[in-house]
Each structure stands twice: as structure tokens, then as C-alpha cells.
């Protein structure tokens, strides 16, 4: 309650800084001055006038700051000197601070009782060395039930106990936030979990599974790599299946890299017989995966770009910038023996393996085994393939480090002869590529000019094509004709004989001169 001050008591003078620094006090002073009341002589006024002023001005002032008007406790507990100077919490910026202090714990209390849990995918991003397994959705996000089964599959890696653990985890609430990367088990395992006793339910879940096909990469120590894939193999002979699944330890070790992962390399296949276009050109693609992994083949979109932005390139899905490739066109699969498979997932334009279509349009295909050197085509040319975005994708498949060329004795001897030739011509025993400044090693494509200088072919290719057939050496500036005709073998033999005869004549002349010099000296 407000306590009036006697008239004979002098009113204290408010500090100048308090009136100038406080914007609310200044506005309050302007309000009182406009009504004919001096704020310094406010104490000399009647109590009724003093009560009327807060009743009319405080409510409007508090509304400007969005403060509730039921803060009577704060205003009643203010000190007398604060009420006199116009700096009470009810009419100054102090009310905002006190209100925030009173209300902040109430707003933050639920957050403290329900802390945010970091998803498993975020733990992968924070980890310096990227860990496996990972899973990416290239299409629509998954549901909460799907994430519950996925989280358990990541922890257990046991297909038989998935249903029991899932029932135990159902009462607990889960986070509905969908992340771009969620660790999970293969989609085929999810099909068995969700499917009921009747076969129709399983078929419907299978259709939904391939509609939201996921990109799965497992580590090298993934158990049951072949079982979790649920392969649907075509009918083959017993001998072929025996050779496929019975791999000795030496062959299996050769198929793996130093981290125990299998690999696949895709290079563009240039069809010389095609008269219209050569297909979509792309840089060689190398992907690595552990047993039981599933690599999605699809179209490059913004969603895919955001999903793979924090994943190493060797674990990316196989995506192309072509309209004839569906968003989830198909997938590669690899089992525990290092065997690779291709599956068409209801693509509209089709998947062709060695010029044979795997399945009709909008239908699933079998898990067809792949062999080293197979030709794979995704889609068909649209509008004649005049635009690059409407061209099909043709590629050659190389499996399990088969493209790695090992330097044998012949390669090393060839490089040694090249270095000896450079030593004779330039006096330098070992010359690096003058374009990229890297060493020339065995099993590399090398271009040797007639002046005995050499470069990597990919480095000098543009210089060769720029003024072909004339070539100007960038090192010594000598010019040569790359289309110059070769001499016949007979002429070469005759030139060799003539050169050998000339050498004999020169040697004899030198011997005769030396003998004359010896005879002349007594």
C-alpha cells in the first residue's frame, strides 16, 4: 500500500542519472509534466492525485512491455525511496527483469525434466572416425514404429530376438523427429517384424519396404551377412550356386581390402556401336561395404545431397543426374562371401544387365548375381538422348579390387628403361611429371614424346588434343608430327647395318692413327 508523506517533510531529489538513463522514467516524467504536475514536487500533491496517476499510467505502461498486471506483490514490496524516484518494479525496466526471473524457471522446468536425447546418427557425425553401420532414406521419412524396430536392430544384430525386444520397447516413448541418417537393420528384417500371420500382410509390407528403400552400409564384422539380405536368387544350377557360396579363405581375403570391406567400381561404358550418343559420362565411382550391405541406386536430388553431406564418399549411394533413372531405381547387395547382386526395384525405365532387362516396368526383379566385367545399363534414352539429362547410364562393373593393377617385373623394368632414357637425354636420373609435379610410377598411363620427355597421359591429354597432330613439347619446345609415317622394317635393317659399318670404319681409323703415333716416337 502507498504511504503518504507529510507536507512538512522535504521531498528528496532524484538523481539525474536515474531520470536520464531510464527510458521508462523519462516517459513517466513526460506524462506527469503534461498533466501539470512536477515530478520533483510530486510529494506535495494530495494522496488522491498520487493514487490516480498510477492507476491510469501504470497499466498502459506495463502493456507496452507485455507484462501482466497482477504483479501486486512486487509493487507492494518495493522500497519507499524507489516509489519516490519513479524506479519501482511496476513502472521501470526492473519489472521486466523480475518478471523474467519469476517466469524463466517455469518455462525451462519441462526441459530439465525431459532432456534432449542425441540420436545415434548424431553420434556418428560427432565421432571423428566415421563408424558403421549407417542407413540413409532417399525418399519419404520413416514412421515412428519403423524407427523403433530400427533402433533395436542396431543394438542387437540378431534377427531372431527382434520381435521379443520390440514388444518390450513399445511402452517407452520415442522421438518423432526424423533424421536424415538412422542406424537400422536391413529393410527385409523390418518386413518380418511387421508382417502378421497371413501372407497378404507380409506382401503389403514388402511393397512398402521397397517403396522406401534404404541405403545400408555395415561394418566388416557384421554377422549373418547373407541371411539378413533375404536374397531372392534366380534359378541356377547346383554347380554355379556351389561355386558362388563356397569360397576358400584365400579368395575371400583377396576380395577384401585392409579394413575388411568389399568394394565395387563403376566406370562409364562407351558404346562405339551407338550412332546417337554414348550415354551419360561420369567420373569412376568406387563404393565400399561390409557383408549384408545394400547400396541404393537412384537419382541425385537435393534430399540426397543433404543426406550424404556428412558421410564419407566411399559410403555414398550410387546416384546419377539423369531423369531416366528413378529416385530408387535399384540396389546393389553384397553377402558375406563377397558376392555382389543387382536388383531392380520397380523402376519405370528398366535395368539391363548385359543387354537383357531384369524385369518388366514397375515390377521387382530377382537378385541377379554380378560378375567382374558385366555391362549394366540404367534406363533408356528419352527424346533421343539429345540432352545429357535424358540419357541412359551405361557402366562397366568391376568387383572387389579387381581393377587394382599390381606392379610386376615387366612394369618395373619398363619404367626403369624410361628413366635410363631420360638420364641419357636430359642427364636427370628420375624426372617427375612437369604438369602435376608427381612421380611417374608403374601401371600408370604415360605419354612419351619423340624428344624423350614423358608425362601422365591424363595431364598432357589436352595439350595433345589442342593442336593434334602437331605436338609442341612443354619442356623443350620441340615440335613433332604425331601422324608421321613409320619407316618400313627393311629400311630400318639397312639403316642399322649402315650405322654399324660406319662405327667400324671410325674405330679402324682411330686405331690406325694411334699406331702411327706410336711408330713416330722412338
Swiss-Prot record:
GO molecular function: ubiquitin protein ligase activity; ubiquitin-protein transferase activity; zinc ion binding
SUPFAM superfamilies found in the cross-reference section: RING/U-box, SMAD/FHA domain
Chain positions of all zinc fingers (RING-type): 433-477
Compartments, record wording: Cytoplasm
Alphabetical list of CDD domains matching this protein: FHA_DMA-like (cd22692), RING-H2_Dmap-like (cd16458)
Region of interest called Disordered, as start-end residue ranges on this chain: 1-56, 69-92
Keywords: Cell cycle, Cell division, Cytoplasm, Isopeptide bond, Metal-binding, Mitosis, Phosphoprotein, Transferase, Ubl conjugation, Ubl conjugation pathway, Zinc, Zinc-finger
Glycyl lysine isopeptide (Lys-Gly) (interchain with G-Cter in ubiquitin) cross-link site: 211, 256, 258, 288, 310, 333, 343, 346, 366, 406, 412, 423
Biased composition (Low complexity): 14-35
GO CC annotation, single: cellular bud tip
Coiled-coil region list: none
Enzyme Commission number(s): 2.3.2.27
Catalyses which reaction(s): S-ubiquitinyl-[E2 ubiquitin-conjugating enzyme]-L-cysteine + [acceptor protein]-L-lysine = [E2 ubiquitin-conjugating enzyme]-L-cysteine + N(6)-ubiquitinyl-[acceptor protein]-L-lysine
Record-given protein name: E3 ubiquitin-protein ligase DMA2
Modification(s) after translation: UBC4-dependent autoubiquitination occurs at Lys-211, Lys-258, Lys-288, Lys-310, Lys-333, Lys-343, Lys-346, Lys-366, Lys-406, Lys-412 and Lys-423. UBC4-dependent autoubiquitination is responsible for DMA2 turnover. UBC13/MMS2-dependent autoubiquitination occurs at Lys-258, Lys-310, Lys-346 and Lys-366. Lys-211, Lys-256, Lys-288, Lys-310, Lys-343, Lys-258, Lys-366 and Lys-412 are also ubiquitinated in trans by DMA1 E3 ligase in association with UBC4.
Entry-linked Pfam families: FHA, zf-RING_11
